[in-house]
UniProtKB/Swiss-Prot annotation:
UniProt keyword Membrane present: no
Entry's family note: Belongs to the universal ribosomal protein uL14 family.
A GO CC term attached to the entry: cytosolic large ribosomal subunit
Listed name of the protein: Large ribosomal subunit protein uL14
InterPro entries per record: Ribosomal_uL14, Ribosomal_uL14_bac-type, Ribosomal_uL14_CS, Ribosomal_uL14_sf
């Protein structure tokens, strides 16, 4: 469950290490975002020479959340950290690698490129 001012780890190789959620996309009064939801964020920490730099405003899709999510079969999925992948306007990732597992919900929300780059889909 991600909301405004939430800080997330970046799970790709764009050069950003941490982002801060500015807005949850998908409705005027939408407060929370989960796995597979798109947010607008600002880069809070980045490595020198990366594709993005500190202060850039980016779109990102959430790939891991600490808050458990119930699935249709009754099982729950939960991760150890909140993480996101920075995306372009056409929902393709800006980086070329994804680090760590991602949720299966990304496949249902048509983020196929992220699913194919991820080392593990849980």
């Amino acid at each position: 469950m991600i909301q405004q001012e939430s800080r997330l780890k970046v799970a790709d190789n764009t050069g950003a290490k941490e982002i801060l959620c500015i807005r949850v996309l998908g409705g005027s009064g939408r407060r929370y975002a989960g796995i597979g939801d798109v947010i607008v964020a600002t880069v809070k920490d980045a490595i020198p020479g990366g594709n993005v730099k500190r202060g850039d405003v980016v779109k990102a899709v959430i790939v891991r959340t600490v808050k458990e999510r119930r699935r249709a079969d009754g099982s729950y999925i939960r991760f150890d950290e909140n993480a996101a992948v920075i995306i372009k306007n056409d929902n393709d990732p800006r980086g070329t690698r994804i680090f760590g597992p991602v949720g299966r919900e990304l496949r249902e929300k048509k983020f196929m490129k992220i699913v194919s780059l991820a080392p593990e889909v849980l």
